[in-house]
């Protein structure tokens, strides 16, 4: 039976994933600072909206007003889809302090309370009948209590998959950290995409690699990508060699 897939909406990324993300998968998008994790997650939501798939974007590390302003730089108008009832932005950043309590429909008062967060996300998903969810990021949920990281990720995955959503869960790691952030989180998700920003001989290179993706074959190579005025663009026909700072054609 053919695997039902969800397009990432990121040029070149679906080719890396052999056609897209398997439906209902929870994907950990991990990487260091400045690697493009937030843009990737927002582009995933935007692509769905453009294809008629409602979505939910959860922000834990940036004011929702700033989120809307930032995406406009790529030509993505979140406000329009919010007004149409196709997009919900969940504010898990302000804690309802200030004017956010007046203007934001979905507010998490205590972002460190996983149960409250899950409850608000569930409500938002049901209200807009979301097919896609992006959480930026899950790191604050367990940064002070790493022992519960895996359990929290399981709860999020179970809830989102149960509601029929395909999700991107942004996760932070240190610039040169080899792990995925939080003990055991890699076992609690269906897929892992790692973004990297490496300095080689005085130049910064962006690249990504799919560490795992349940339900589908995928490229096992590290591919270069760039951030343009229209978002992220991946080159599935090229492979990046970190040690040498070289980009080569993919060989069969």
Swiss-Prot record:
Keyword ATP-binding recorded: yes
SUPFAM superfamilies according to UniProt: P-loop containing nucleoside triphosphate hydrolases (SSF52540)
InterPro entries assigned: KaiC-like_dom, KaiC_dom, P-loop_NTPase, UPF0273_KaiC-like
Domain KaiC: 4-248
Residues where ATP binds: 31-38
Pfam hit, one: ATPase
Top-level taxon: Archaea
PROSITE patterns: KAIC
Keywords for this protein: ATP-binding, Nucleotide-binding
Gene Ontology terms, MF aspect: ATP binding
Similarity comment: Belongs to the UPF0273 family.
Listed PANTHER family: UPF0273 PROTEIN TM_0370 (PTHR43637:SF1)
The protein's name: UPF0273 protein MK0039
